[in-house]
Amino acid sequence: MASPGSSPFSPEEIATEGLKPEEYDDIVQRLGRHPNRAELGMFGVMWSEHCCYKNSRPLLSQFPTEGKHVLVGPGENAGVVDLGNGLQLAFKVESHNHPSAVEPFQGAATGVGGILRDIFTMGARPIAVLNSLRFGDLDDARTRRLFSGVVAGIAHYGNCVGVPTVGGEVYFDPAYTGNPLVNAMAMGLMETAEIVKAGASGVGNPVLYVGSTTGRDGMGGASFASAELDATSEVEDRPAVQVGDPFLEKSLIEACLEAFQTGAVVAAQDMGAAGLTCSTAEMAEKGGVGIDLDLDLIPNRETGMVPYEYLLSESQERMLFVAEKGREQELIDIFHRWGLQAVVAGSVIAEPIVKIRFQGEVAAEIPATALSDNTPIYKREVLAEPPEYVQKAREWSCDRIPPGTAEGIEIQGKLNSWSDILLQLLQVPTIASKRWVYRQYDHQVQNNTVVLPGDADATIVRLRPVAHQETPDQGVDSKTAVAATIDCNSRYVYLDPYEGAKMTVAEAARNLSCVGAEPIAVTDNLNFGSPEKPIGYWQLAEACRGLSEACRHLQTPVTGGNVSLYNETFDADGQPQPIYPTPVIGMVGLVPDLTKTCVQGWQADGDLIYLLGIPLDVQSDLVTLGATEYLASIHHQVAGEPPHADLDLEAQVQATCRHGIQQGWLHSAHDCAEGGVAVALAESCISGQRGADIQVPTGSNRWDQVLFGEGGARIVISVSATHQAAWESYLQEHLPQYWQQIGTVTTPNSELTLTTNVHQTLIKVRIEEATQRWAQAIESKLA
């Protein structure tokens, strides 16, 4: 243990690096001496939650990570799954929350750049980007600035680098006012015999630094991402935000993929969080070797840089390679040809340490495992009972809001018809059209995007040989495709982390099934508040338990992901305001025949409309008003128990939907999520620009629960009358009691009507008006 007063650093200096006093003592014990300034910084970033997962690692161990498609699981730059026919898919999701809160454009842009590097570092050519975004209330000026800046940053980087942004989700809630969430997911295609991994090997092999130069931008970004934001963050933490160059990244992609084809690359690691420190430590530790690096050889863009700055810089578009000895010049020539930096900056050594040299002296010398694997782990106690806010929320019942009649519901002395309520929900930014967002993205570059953003419940990207990805007119005869979605209902998770997390996985799988894709694997991004607070850790632990159970049940193993904790800000009174717990799930699936898939909009007049899942006339605790968008937006109450996931029913419903699509019976499929059945029907009307005539069984004393209740593993689908007999025969055999024919598709630009079987009209809205309200909701707030 360090003796009092013996440290060359003050408690404030140690705390600035994100280290606790006991962690500093641990460092001294491991080194047998006090660290120097550079070493202190290295430990600070590598022992941050962002890099070492010291609070979350014990919880992540329960995730299923193996499956028939999984080739690479957690621990590498990205997960990899086998798609068949010699093709593999690398995919991963990662957060850039704190940087985007401080500098939204660059924060979001470099988030895209970073996740793309994780993909092509594995040897995969990036084929698509998705994102999950969360902001505060759009009536707030700062929220509008953050929202506009983040979307512009994503568009700038993705469009310039030539990778399509094909889908995602955007949520708005006051819980994210101080701390927005920016999660970026990327996918890449490969057909290599050997996946490029990060573990260094071969004593004497040269270590190459390639890509851009090193500057002082992004200093200590990993530590910054592992602490709460406060009122000074937008000014004081701005230097921790990186600055990206998508054009340079495009060259880096091509150079790296060309270099990998030579067979001269032994290992590769991108320089993301913690920069040179992380890349050297992780490569050494994973390979069981050491790395000797000379900072004097590192190309820099600023003068007078010291080891601390070199090692903690998070300048973008940089990579570290281990090359076969004697073939380094072959690789250097490739990078120079692409206009990039490439130098031999060190070598692999037998002693498992990270040795850093500067101006002829050893600037740092640390065991690799102390930085990368044998890091502090905190096994915290989980609350034995749900916290008070959850117990109070569970006391809520439908009696807290007026019962309503077939005509509508009285709110604050005024009768609101169910038609009025539906139109109001369509204007809620979380539900409303996201066209303002995705019209800024180039979603068709590479010519493989099968379904455009907003047209279906998941995106679909055609699979072509890697050699043809950059040539739009070649390899187009392939019928196989990959589908992807990214999802989370954070209000569910806030009110019940366990059930909410299960529902998140179920919804992601349901979205894939709605386009005919078989879900095969998951990447997760766990966005939570401080784990050092009992409630925050309970939320994290319960959510991980729910994710694990759902992934096992639906056979979607976790291949990797990201943990982003300390997503909290302080209000004017100095009280911490954590975000809603937000475990975002990115899920990928296989589409066997892209000519047999589904969009969410009605396709033909006279098609029959079915509801899969819990029927409308069945009272079930799987369908609830608790935690719904209706309760929050119309009654301004965040309360109640969210719907519980019946994973057996989910699997049955999803398999039935996929089979119907593959048989060519289904014309459309759309899952019932925020806003329940009524909103799902309206969205299908808007997307297809056709009306629908729906019959709703009578007998309910809660029409709002029938119309706007959520849950129940529900999917709204449409089928041609010519396939009715075959479809219903299949339903009777494989999904008895969990399907219902509820109506028909009507003529273009007509009306959505929901009528009881005693001829009471519950909802009657013109498609033109519904479309206008839905389409203009976000744009009108930004005008």
Swiss-Prot record:
GO term, biological process aspect, one: 'de novo' IMP biosynthetic process
Molecular function per GO: ATP binding; magnesium ion binding; phosphoribosylformylglycinamidine synthase activity
UniProt GO cellular component terms: cytoplasm
Pfam families membership: AIRS, AIRS_C, FGAR-AT_linker
Residues where ATP binds: 53, 92, 524, 561
Annotated segments matching region Disordered: 1-22
Residues annotated as binding Mg(2+) 2: 118, 270
Domain of life: Bacteria
Catalysed conversion reaction: N(2)-formyl-N(1)-(5-phospho-beta-D-ribosyl)glycinamide + L-glutamine + ATP + H2O = 2-formamido-N(1)-(5-O-phospho-beta-D-ribosyl)acetamidine + L-glutamate + ADP + phosphate + H(+)
EC number: 6.3.5.3
Enzyme class: ligase
InterPro entries on file: PRibForGlyAmidine_synth_PurL (IPR010074), PurL_linker (IPR041609), PurM-like_C_dom (IPR010918), PurM-like_C_sf (IPR036676), PurM-like_N (IPR016188), PurM-like_N_sf (IPR036921)
Functional note: Part of the phosphoribosylformylglycinamidine synthase complex involved in the purines biosynthetic pathway. Catalyzes the ATP-dependent conversion of formylglycinamide ribonucleotide (FGAR) and glutamine to yield formylglycinamidine ribonucleotide (FGAM) and glutamate. The FGAM synthase complex is composed of three subunits. PurQ produces an ammonia molecule by converting glutamine to glutamate. PurL transfers the ammonia molecule to FGAR to form FGAM in an ATP-dependent manner.
Family annotation (HAMAP family): PurL_2 (MF_00420)
Summary of subunit composition and partner proteins: Monomer. Part of the FGAM synthase complex composed of 1 PurL, 1 PurQ and 2 PurS subunits.
Family designation: Belongs to the FGAMS family.
Protein name stated in the entry: Phosphoribosylformylglycinamidine synthase subunit PurL
Gene name of the record: purL
